[in-house]
Curated annotation (Swiss-Prot):
Record gene name: sojo
Gene Ontology cellular-component annotations: cytoplasm; cytoskeleton
Main location: cytoplasm
Record organism: Xenopus laevis
Keyword entries, A-Z: Coiled coil, Cytoplasm, Cytoskeleton
PANTHER family recorded: COILED-COIL DOMAIN-CONTAINING PROTEIN 18 (PTHR18875:SF8), SARCOMA ANTIGEN NY-SAR-24/CYTOSKELETAL PROTEIN SOJO (PTHR18875)
Bias (Polar residues): 71-82, 92-104
Region of interest (Disordered), ranges: 71-104, 366-388, 1313-1335
Coiled-coil residues: 92-1183
Name of the molecule in the record: Cytoskeletal protein Sojo
Biased composition (Basic and acidic residues): 1313-1323
Localization in the cell: Cytoplasm, Cytoskeleton
The keyword Cytoplasm is annotated on this UniProt entry: yes
RNA-binding in keyword set: no
Length: 1335
């Protein structure tokens, strides 16, 4: 660049430049005063943002800036002196306030002056650099002009006429050169002075940097503290939310319990009324059943007697049937014989009939012969008639015998027909055949026919009797079948009852053992509950202390939040300043491009002027035109190569070929300046090497930090994986435990169902339902105590809720304050934006002023060009032109290289802009996240308010329900008072036992409820674990995003390192080619300055990137700490859950033992119930026997037991005998003898004694001193089977017979004895049983 100082050329333009500089200084001071407050907040960036590059604006400032500096210093010193004098003159009372104010004002003034001095130093440095560049240019021009003059003097001797003019011009040029040398010396002095000032400022900068490092460390510590406080606050909020949830659950549980208690009270009332109704109905049923039993027993006895008679009759009938069958067989045989005899007799009869006929004929013949032979023949006739009379008598005897035999046969046939119907027809046929066989006899003998008719009538009567008897037999057989069916049914019912009694006995034994175990476990659990209450009190104390700590931490949080807000404001301001700096850098680049274009245009104008001068000097440059044409051809070839570059540079190369011809004489002067520039370049390169070395060190440190943090992240990821695996295992274990819990709950439900069924049976069998009211009183008292406790706990919870609501309100107020501060910061930001707009307007004004100054500079440059045209007239040699052409080619190659470098730099600038846009996007995303968090906070506040309203509603409902419960309790107490009057002394023992039973049942229910609550807690813990796992997943995602961001930053850093390496290579290439860069050093310097600025900007961006990486590293460290703390918290919670699971296991085992104990107790009670049932049956039997005794007569007593007193003396022997006596024995003796064997309670024995008739002898019993109870007491007070025990001494030697009731009772007694002996762990119950037996 061919620029010279305007002050040495034209003295006319000095005042205008001075005025402009003064105006500019005034504007700078005014802008400095407005930007002091900003620079106080962002001192770090203000120090790092000193303009280190040179621009054309700095060339327009003159040396008057130093005078202004001196004037300002003098004014400051005068002001300071005046302030000190004024301070000395002031009185002592206002010394402290004035001192503080003066010191503050002085500090402000010093800060302003420091900033002003820094800017002036920067401007002086830039001016020095510009002056050095101008001096170098002038020196190069002088050397060129001198060399050209020498060349012209040696070459052209004919032009001696122009020598004096040229000498004058040379003298003027030398004078100008001397003046410029003097200016250079002064500028060198200024440079030395500015270097000293720079050294001091660098020392001050190092001090400030150290202070900034300390401030950064403090900021990092404060950020960590803020994060920790935020974590603690979040944990406190989370704990508060958990407590609110727990309170809501507790309230829900309490309401459910209260509702259940109310429902149970109502159910108990209903049950009580139902029980009373059922009791009355049962009593009526018992009376009806007693009557029915008596009737059924009478009917059974009648049936038994009838059965016996029927059996006897049946036996007789069977005997008769057997006899009849034998007779039938005999009759059949006889019939066969008689048939054979009848055939013989028929034959004989026919023979007799023939003989009779013959006799009749003979008789007729004899009569005729008699008549013929009168008297002489009388004697032989008498003899013949005597012979025939004998024959007739014999025949009649035979007929009579046969008739008798026929009658016998007919009688036998009738008997056979009565027994069987088979032989009736055959016998009748035989009889008819027999009767028909003798028609002659019947006709002859009327007596036989009459007898036959009588026999037929007898047969008919016998048949009628037979039919009647068969009907009776059938009826008797039907009755027998019914009786047998009834007997089988009774046997089956007896067997079922015996089996039921055995089962009930076993269940009662199990329930008794279960109740004992439940009582033991209840004692243990009461101890545990007391210990837990102590732990709860200790935890409440710890919680109160933690709340106090939380309050202090919240105050600290507020302070830290204020600091964070201030820091965020500072960060936002710095960010805005960075954006402004980037915009300024962009504007500067654009201005530089515009300036370069203007310089190119200016050079084009210069070239046009030079072409005009060349037209005037065509005579002197005819020889050079050929060479110029040759050079133009070469330039055209170079232009073809540089088509990718700018077209304007091709025009510049064409015009520079003509311009370099006139600058051949200045090469010698420029060589010296080139050496100086080379030394400056070496210094710059050394500085660049140092900067690069620092960059490499920083890069290595950053890489090492990234490696360490990546290793830490890897370790953390491994830990998180292990933790997730452990959490999964614990979740699986929890699932298994839940399954076991569900199974055990199912078993408990089954056990409770069985217990309920047994209780139902027990309540059905028991008749003393009225005694449950005493237990209701106890339950009410217990429920009132529980209600009072719950009220106290609710009051405490309400207080805690009030405190927490106050804390929430305080947090809301803090949030509102934060919102107000945010609004205030937004307002301040708007103000700052307005100030930035005003500053931009001022900068535009300054730019217009700079444009005016540039116009002035252009005018001075035109004048310098005019002066140089005079020198160009002397340029005529061709050798130097050839060298210039070569140099132009080299410069063109260098220009192409520099253009490529500029392209690379533009690419780097674009990449940096992309990184900035990415950072802006990340900042915007963070702002969006902050907005989302604020919205979540608002939603959480709304939810807390809704929960507070719900809690208030629940409190009102609880109060209403408590009032209703109190009213109901009062009503129940009145009912209890009315019921207590109807209770007796005998009921108290039963009430105690039943109260213990129901307490155990209630405690079992409470345990079940506790198990359900523990299940709910387990589910809540699982939900919390799921939420924490979700949070861990989110954190893992955030860490992955941060890793990606770090990788991107790594990529950007690697890209920057590559660009730095490329720049180093290019710098080395420039160092190699620095010797050849003689003519375009100014352009190279400007470009180097641009590169230096870009390097500084890159350094700033690298510093910002390092800061961002440090911030990310700090965030990662914070996240690591948070994750570690959360992992520790999760570990603690897991340990707590494991402890709770172990406790649950132990509690489940204990409850299983309790359930077993209750089952054993229930088994015992069921056995006792079986005993009672047996005794009730014996009691009913005695009553039946008593009623039988009233009906039977006294002689039976004397018949069965002639010694009743002896039997009463020996009850056991009489026992064994009396159960085997036939039912005909009277029951009165049994009532006297079997009382001791039945083992009835003493009240029932005395009732029986009272009911016994006065004639019966008195009973003797071993037990004495028994209180007599009337029969009304039996009706009023129900019978309790648990108040007495078995007599252990009454044991039989022989085996019991289960077919009889005594055998069953003996068997039950033995089983009870066997069940009572192994129960060594419950001596109190055995003592109670013994006491009952004694009482």
């Amino acid at each position: 660049m061919e620029l010279n100082m305007p002050t040495y050329n034209d003295q006319i333009e000095e005042p205008t430049d001075g005025l402009l500089l003064m105006g500019k200084l005034m504007q700078g001071e005014w802008s400095i005063e407005h930007e002091d407050e900003k620079r106080d907040h962002s001192s770090e960036h203000s120090l790092s943002r000193v303009p280190l590059g040179l621009t054309l604006e700095d060339l327009e400032q003159s040396c008057k800036s130093r005078e202004n500096l001196l004037r300002s210093r003098n004014t400051v010193s005068q002001n300071a002196g005046n302030s000190l004098r004024a301070f000395k003159d002031k009185p002592t009372n206002s010394q402290s306030g004035s001192l503080i104010r003066n010191t503050e004002q002085q500090n402000r003034q010093l800060k302003e002056k420091l900033n002003f001095l820094q800017e002036q130093n920067a401007s002086l440095v830039s001016q020095n650099h510009s002056l050095m560049n101008k001096i170098d240019c002038v020196q190069t021009e002088l050397t060129k002009s001198r060399s050209r003059i020498r060349y012209v003097e040696s070459a052209i001797g004919a032009r001696a006429m122009r020598l004096p003019d040229l000498e004058e011009r040379i003298l003027t040029l030398e004078a100008k050169a001397d003046a410029q040398e003097n200016a250079l010396r002064t500028t060198e002095d200024q440079l030395e002075h500015s270097r000293h000032i720079l050294a001091e400022k660098e020392r001050i900068l190092q001090m400030f940097k150290d202070e900034m490092k300390a401030l950064k460390e403090e900021l990092f510590a404060s950020c960590r503290l803020c994060k920790r406080t935020e974590k603690q606050r979040n944990e406190a909020l989370f704990n508060a939310e958990e407590l609110t949830k727990a309170l809501q659950q507790y309230k829900n549980k309490m309401t459910e319990k209260m509702e259940k208690v109310q429902e149970e009270g109502e159910l108990l009332k209903n049950k009580f009324s139902n029980c009373e109704k059922e009791q009355d109905a049962l009593q009526q049923k018992c009376v009806m059943l007693d009557t029915e039993l008596e009737k059924s027993r009478d009917a059974l006895r009648n049936l038994q007697s009838e059965n016996i008679i029927r059996q006897e009759r049946h036996q007789c009938v069977e005997a008769k049937n057997a006899e009849l069958i034998s007779l039938l067989t005999q009759s059949n045989q006889r019939i066969l014989r008689l048939e054979s005899e009848l055939e013989h007799k028929e034959k004989a009869l026919q023979e007799n009939i023939d003989e009779n006929k013959a006799m009749k004929d003979c008789f007729a013949k004899s009569k005729q012969s008699e008549t013929i032979s009168d008297q002489p023949k009388e004697q032989p006739a008498d003899s013949a008639s005597d012979g025939s009379g004998k024959l007739i008598a014999d025949l009649r005897a035979k007929l009579l015998i046969r008739e008798a035999e026929n009658k016998e046969l007919q009688a036998e046939l009738v008997n056979g027909k009565l027994l069987t119907n088979r032989y009736r027809n055959s016998l009748e046929k035989n009889c008819l055949d027999a009767l028909e066989a003798e028609p002659v006899k019947l006709n002859l003998q009327n007596t036989a026919e009459e007898k036959y008719l009588q026999l037929e009538l007898l047969c008919k009567q016998i048949q009628m009797d037979k039919e009647r008897l068969t009907d009776c037999v059938k009826e008797l057989q039907g009755k027998l079948g019914k009786a047998q069916i009834e007997l089988t049914n009774t046997k089956l019912s007896m067997e079922q009852r015996t089996s039921q009694l055995q089962l009930i006995q076993q269940e009662l034994l199990e329930k008794a053992s279960k109740t004992t175990k439940l009582e033991q476990e209840l004692v243990k659990k009461r101890m545990k509950i007391s210990a837990l209450q102590k732990l709860v009190e200790e935890k409440s104390q710890v919680y109160s202390a933690a709340e106090a700590r939380n309050a202090g931490l919240e105050e600290k949080l507020k302070n830290y939040k204020d600091q964070i807000v201030n820091l965020e404001d500072n960060i936002n301001k710095e960010h805005a300043e960075v954006l402004l700096a980037l915009e300024r850098s962009k504007d500067i680049h654009q201005d530089q491009q515009k300036e370069l274009m203007k310089q190119i245009e200016h050079l084009q104008l210069q070239l046009e002027m030079k072409n005009l001068h060349a037209g005037e000097q065509k005579h002197t440059i005819t020889i050079l035109q050929q060479e110029t044409l040759w050079h133009e051809q070469q330039l055209e070839s170079v232009n073809h190569l540089l088509t990718q570059a700018r077209k304007e540079l091709e025009i510049q190369t064409k015009n520079t070929s003509a311009a370099m011809k006139s600058l051949q004489n200045q090469v010698e002067v420029e060589s010296a300046k080139v050496s100086q520039l080379e030394s400056a370049l070496t210094v710059c390169k050394e500085e660049l090497a140092l900067y690069l070395h620092e960059l490499e060190d920083n890069r290595e440190q950053f890489e090492n930090q990234i490696k360490t943090k990546s290793e830490e992240l890897w370790c953390l990821q491994n830990e998180i994986k292990l933790r997730t695996q452990s959490l999964q295992e614990t979740s699986e274990e929890n699932v298994r435990l839940q399954q076991t819990l569900q199974q055990q709950q199912h078993m408990l439900q089954q056990g409770t169902g069985r217990i309920g069924e047994l209780e139902d049976h027990h309540t059905e069998l028991e008749k003393q339902v009225s005694k449950l009211e005493f237990e209701l009183e106890k339950q009410r008292s217990m429920s009132e105590d529980m209600l009072q406790r719950t009220k106290d706990s609710l009051h405490a919870a309400n207080k805690e809720l009030g405190l927490k609501t106050e804390e929430v309100q305080e947090l809301c107020s803090t949030l509102n304050q934060v919102k107000l501060e945010l609004k205030h910061t937004n307002v301040t930001l708007l103000q700052m934006e307005e100030e930035l707009v005003s500053l931009k307007n001022k900068e535009e004004k300054n730019a217009s002023m700079l444009k005016l100054l540039q116009m002035d500079m252009q005018k001075t440059q035109v004048e310098l060009d005019k002066k140089a045209c005079a020198v160009l007239e002397l340029e005529e040699k061709l050798h130097i032109a050839e060298k210039d052409s070569k140099r132009t080619e080299e410069m063109e190659t260098q220009l192409s290289g520099m253009q490529k470098e500029l392209d690379g730099y533009t690419k780097q600038v674009e990449e940096l802009q992309e990184t900035l846009t990415k950072t802006h996007l990340s900042v915007e995303e963070k702002q969006v996240i902050i907005q989302g968090l604020t919205e979540k906070l608002r939603s959480y506040k709304q939810e807390l308010e809704e929960r507070d309203h719900e809690v208030l509603d629940m409190d009102q409902l609880l109060k209403d329900r408590n009032w209703e419960l109190k009213q109901r309790a009062a009503q129940l107490t009145q009912l209890d008072m009315s019921i207590r009057g109807h209770k007796g002394e005998m009921e108290q023992k039963i009430i105690r036992l039943e109260s213990a039973l129901e307490k155990a049942e209630l405690e079992a229910r409470d345990h079940i409820k506790e198990i359900s609550s523990l299940d709910e807690r387990l589910q809540q813990a699982r939900d919390q674990l799921c939420e924490k796992e979700f949070d861990l997943m989110q954190k893992d995602q955030i860490i992955n995003q941060l890793k990606k961001d770090i990788e991107r930053s790594h990529q950007t850093v690697t890209d920057m390192e590559k660009t730095l390496k490329v720049q180093e290579r290019r710098i080395s290439e420039k160092h190699q080619d620095g010797v050849d860069l003689s003519k375009q050093v100014c352009l190279a310097q400007e470009r180097m300055q641009l590169t230096h600025q870009e390097l500084l900007e890159t350094r700033q961006q690298l510093a910002e990137a390092q800061k961002e990486s440090d911030r990310l590293a700090q965030k990662l460290e914070g996240m690591d700490l948070i994750s570690k703390e959360k992992i520790q918290h999760l570990k603690q919670k897991l340990e707590e859950t494991n402890d709770t699971v172990c406790n649950l296991k132990t509690e489940l085992q204990a409850r299983n033992e309790v359930i077993k104990a209750t089952n054993e107790v229930l088994i015992l009670k069921e056995s006792e119930l079986t005993r009672l049932k047996a005794r009730i049956s014996s009691y009913e039997r005695t009553l039946g026997l008593k009623q039988l005794s009233d009906t039977t007569a006294l002689p039976s007593i004397s018949f069965t037991d002639p010694h009743p007193l002896d039997s009463s003396k020996h009850p056991e022997a009489s026992d064994f005998k009396m159960w085997h006596i036939s039912p005909s024995i009277s029951a009165s003796n049994l009532s006297l003898t079997d009382m001791s064997s039945l083992e009835l309670p003493k009240s029932m024995l005395e009732d029986l004694r009272n009911l016994a008739p006065p004639d019966s002898p008195p009973m003797k019993d071993t037990s004495e001193g028994v209180s007599c109870v009337s029969s009304d007491s039996l009706n009023n007070s129900s019978f309790n089977p648990l108040t007495y025990a078995l007599d252990e001494n009454s044991d039989f030697t022989d085996c019991p017979d289960l077919t009889t009731l005594t055998g069953m009772l003996k068997y039950i007694k033995k089983e009870m004895r066997l069940s009572e002996y192994p129960q060594e762990h419950s001596p109190s119950k055995a003592a109670g049983i013994d006491g009952g037996s004694l009482g």
